[in-house]
Amino acid sequence: MKGDRLVIRELNKNLGLLLVTINQYFLHARILKNWGFEELGEHFFKQSIVEMKAADDLIERILFLEGLPNLQELGKLLIGESTEEIIACDLTKEQEKHEALLAAIATAEAQQDYVSRDLLEKQKDTNEKHIDWLETQQELIGKIGLPNYLQTAAQED
């Protein structure tokens, strides 16, 4: 099925952001694990898998619309050098993705591509949940202090 070029462009823009966040979350997961924060690292690793599945969904949709998934135009990774920076970098990237998702949803709606819109809406919902989680981590650090936060992050079940 031949898709609308504007929708395909927006899908590719969101795909590029997902490809960046896959790598960013994966690296942050390994950094945190290396620092001894197993549980926190595991959360970021699982998030990289969520991002990978979302990217796969976009690739399938772009191909269905007879477009070409653009895997070459990757943005810049934001890599933190402390736990606070990691959370801040990931929040920045998630907020960037949120803006791109809103724009893509509006384009899909305007072009009457309701299947793409629904796919993007689902990804937006997941994105908002992760933004909330990251903001909660920042609030926890602010309320209990970084040393206490890191102590809880280092504890194993």
UniProtKB/Swiss-Prot annotation:
Subcellular location(s) of the protein: Cytoplasm
Claim: Heme is one of the keywords in the record: yes
Keyword tags: Cytoplasm, Heme, Iron, Iron storage, Metal-binding
Organism ancestry: Bacteria, Pseudomonadati, Pseudomonadota, Betaproteobacteria, Neisseriales
Heme found in the keyword field: yes
KO phenotype (gene knockout): Grows less well under iron-limiting conditions, increased sensitivity to H(2)O(2) and paraquat.
SUPFAM superfamilies on file: Ferritin-like
GO cellular component: cytosol
Designated name of the protein: Bacterioferritin BfrB
